[in-house]
Amino acid sequence: MTASKILLLIIDGVGDRPCGVLGNKTPLQAAKIPNLDRLATEGICGIMDPIAPGVRGGSDTSHLSLLGYDPHIYYTGRGPLEAAGCGIKMEPGMIGFRANYATIDDDGNVIDRRAGRIPDTTEITAAVKNGVDLSKYGVEIEFSPGTGHRAALALKGKGLSAAVSSNDPKKTGVQPKTIHPDDDSKEAAFTAEVCNEFSRQAAEILKNHPVNLERKARGEFPANVVLIRGAGEMGVYETFEEKHELSGSVVAAAALIAGIGSSVGLERIPVLPTTPLDEQVRLVCRELEKKDFVLFNVKTADEYGHDGKAVEKTKYLEEVDAALLPFFDMPELMIAVCGDHSTPCTIKEHSADPVPLILHGDGTRIDLVTNYDEISCAAGGLCRISGGSLMPILLDLIDKTHKYGA
């Protein structure tokens, strides 16, 4: 029997380096992960450079690569992908931005870049979206809430450019920056002016909004300024189904990953960071009943890597492992398990270390690897591959590859 469906499970930031607090083991080596070890034992393993050796991939560029989209061709910035993930219908040529609500004091200085980690911005985001008027520029806006203090902005109109800076000072105690053009074009100068006007009007709307007045009355930071960054022009993507001849869905709590999936035509299945892992797995299984392919991203390991919390990262990997049991009951499934990049706790940042990879399903050759970790997988039968090779290998394993030559 040959597998016929693909699950691409990306444990965000899974790769690591030896951690002293773990006895010089990586979190994967220290974790008790019997299900992942079983997948490794019954499958074929290797290590993978998500983009290329020595390249520290972002979650955006790496996911594009793993889905078969060369980031050197398709990547136009994080902003439009984040905007798509927040539910904005991004069209080619629209300019997308990442956004954060923050708090400024009476002197205009930023005192909290996350507005006291405000849990929900739906109401104030709607007020900004409906209240900001850029019609004198011939520009329409889309503004959508993300999780917590996050949001996304998109601009639509003629003569726009993504070559603009950010108003985010990236520190407290100073005022938000004025947005400037990043090149000498009239389009960049025009877009910078539009962005500054958006920021000015948004701050006026937020200043006395009831939500913020209530937060101040409770002694909480008001969300009274919008910081935008990561400008990018929405590109043109060949759909995943056209490219790979597979129908597909994306299950990801991270807006960026959901946005990447929806941008290439995968159906977005909404989940929240608070959605339990077993419920996310249930949704993945439901989608696999209807679709040929599911991209399933779990994010928290990456966050613990950025925070330098090796013990917590280890425990989270054990939680992921425990949620995987239902996939063993799907004999038609080809499972690929990997990371989009390494996020070592020792450096609290993405690194270029290759990530461990498992391919499990009927039709795979079985190697001698019995553990899922960075060192064990390096001895596997896949050896070392690039992220751009992953989809072609998976398509071959489910007998969807077209012959090259006669």
UniProtKB/Swiss-Prot annotation:
Catalytic activity reads: (2R)-2-phosphoglycerate = (2R)-3-phosphoglycerate
Please give one Gene Ontology molecular function term for this protein. Answer: metal ion binding
Q: Which parts of the chain span the membrane according to its record?
A: none
From which residue to which does the signal peptide run? none
**EC code(s) of this entry:** 5.4.2.12
Biological or metabolic pathway of the protein: Carbohydrate degradation; glycolysis; pyruvate from D-glyceraldehyde 3-phosphate: step 3/5
In the UniProt record, does the keyword Transmembrane occur?
A: no
InterPro entries, alphabetically? Alkaline_phosphatase_core_sf, ApgAM_prokaryotes, Metalloenzyme, Pglycerate_mutase_ApgM
Task: Please list where the region (Disordered) is annotated.
Answer: 164-184
GO biological process terms, alphabetically, are:
glycolytic process
Keyword vocabulary terms for this entry: Glycolysis, Isomerase
Please report which protein family the annotation says this sequence is part of.
Answer: Belongs to the BPG-independent phosphoglycerate mutase family. A-PGAM subfamily.
Biological role stated in the UniProt entry: Catalyzes the interconversion of 2-phosphoglycerate and 3-phosphoglycerate.
Q: What is this protein called?
A: 2,3-bisphosphoglycerate-independent phosphoglycerate mutase
In its UniProt entry, the species of origin is given as: Methanocorpusculum labreanum (strain ATCC 43576 / DSM 4855 / Z)
